[in-house]
Amino acid sequence: MRPDKGYDLTEKELKALEKRIYDSYKEAYDGLTDIIKEYFAKFADRDASEKARLDAGDITEEQYKHWRLAQIGRGKRFEALRDKVAERMTNANAAAVAYVNDATPGIYSLNRNFAAYTIEQVTGDVGFDLWDEQTVKRLIVEQPELMPYYPPKRALKRGIDLAWGKKQITASVTSSILQGKSIKHMADDLQSRIVTMNRDSAIRTARTAVTGAQNAGRMDSYFAAEKMGIKCRKEWMATLDGRTRHSHAMLDGEVVDNDKKFSNGCRFPGDPQGRPEEIYNCRCTLVSVIEGIDTSNGKRRDRYGIMPNMTFAQWEKSKRGEGYLQR
């Protein structure tokens, strides 16, 4: 089954979110250039003296390597470098989390509305209200578990903090020394590896949060439909390409009651209550299965008459009191 319009609109929002995150880390990367160059330029002078001793046979390769490692273990200059880089990365990570939190309410409302649209496309106007992201933001205050959200304290528990960053920086330089890399390679590796690792992790976190918000929003409409007397169930729809995990490809097309979990233990794709291996970086979505109705050729009625094949944009317009057929 091809992804629906709601999925496509969500992907568009995700691309914009990923760009904001990418730009944030690009700024952090650029800001580290002078800091790292300055440190390794000074380190190069001292390193050249020790290398000369090695070449002259005054010390062994092992002694030279231990000297280099000692500069990390007790070097104040390295500690200053490490702290500056870690602080930059922590700030970039905090910005990425803020971007995710800013985007997900809009994703939730978009998919809540789209799910309502797909239901009304075959049942007629049953009174769904049009939501916006401000509505969702107000609900999050009352119901914190409504959708994925990363407050500062929770973000720190996820390892996005200074202590974690310092360990990664030390590990990067230590690895370069043990591999016998040149000063230039050490500097390049530190700058690219730390930024790329943090950026890629942030983008995967964004994808996970967006998928969770997308499908939590759809579930909201499914439960609302049931309260209106519409019998519907939920169907797992996988993104069938080479990047989809095998277990989710096997879930494609599985249908369960709205209050039940799918066979992988998730209520919906990106379920924050699911196991990490089932939700992290998930790109699947939900569709509604309405009992006794073939949705493949549905027609719509708004207050102004029957409207076949109404688009999502037209449906939104009608909900604002601007009937598509009224024109």
What do the predicted segments below correspond to?
Residues 200-301:
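Acidic, glycine-rich two-metal-ion catalytic cores of nucleic acid-processing enzymes
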Residues 1-196, 289-327:
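N-terminal leader/targeting and assembly helices and adjacent pre-domain segments
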